[in-house]
Amino acid sequence: MCYYRTTGLIVTQMQELVRRVNNALDKPWNKHSGRPKSLGLHKAVEAACMYLRQNATQEFIGDCRDTSQPTISRYTAVLVPLVKSVLEEFVPSAADAIEVVKGRVILVDGTLTPCWSYEEHQELWNKKHKTTGYNAQLISLLDGTAAWVSGPLAGKTHDAKAFKETGAADILKEAGGGFGDKGYQGTGLVTPKKKPIGGELTLSDKEYNSQISSFRAPVERLVAHFKNWKMLHTDYRRPYSTYHDAFDAARALFFFSITWGFE
């Protein structure tokens, strides 16, 4: 069976993930007696991954798997933190990223991962995008290789501030320079020139900015690839308290999908 379109994983990766989840369970997924679960572990893990990949409603996923929305809700609540845990080793830490980027030029970009407007969490409002969400920082090499993805910060956090708070600035210190967009001015990254107040950019400034943009294209592709996990691209709808586990699980699946089986 092909899993890539629904979960982002190839067959062997899904098999490996199920094996890891099974080993991490406190007790067998299906009891030896009593009523069996409506989905076996393989199908349940697939449903949880489908939720992260597609950000579809639980009712829709239940229909696809011939089970109920409450069942998908329960399985998602149990399995998403497990997916995060068993794949954590594939997510590069800042220290791992420093080893990769030493002496090499890096590309940095920030992205907003949108979520519902939780009334009690006004810090998630992002003025630039005029919506609520979280700020994540991504670093790639010039060839687009994913070096690091930060954890999420509140959506109100400006990229320049997030660059420092997430540890991306420490990674830059060990790199051989880096490029960012206008939101990173003053961080040590090479950035495009802003239009002066009441003036216009010169032709040479426009050409310079165009070159910066072309250099940054690989990290923008990385952002797009990362956000193929639709829970990072469209509004996250589950309770606020579950967001960080879901983000971490999606991030882990992203790195797992581009590394495991390709050594």
Give, region by region, the residue ranges found by the protein language model.
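Short, charged/polar micro-motifs that form catalytic or ligand-binding hotspots
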Residues: K37, Y51, G62
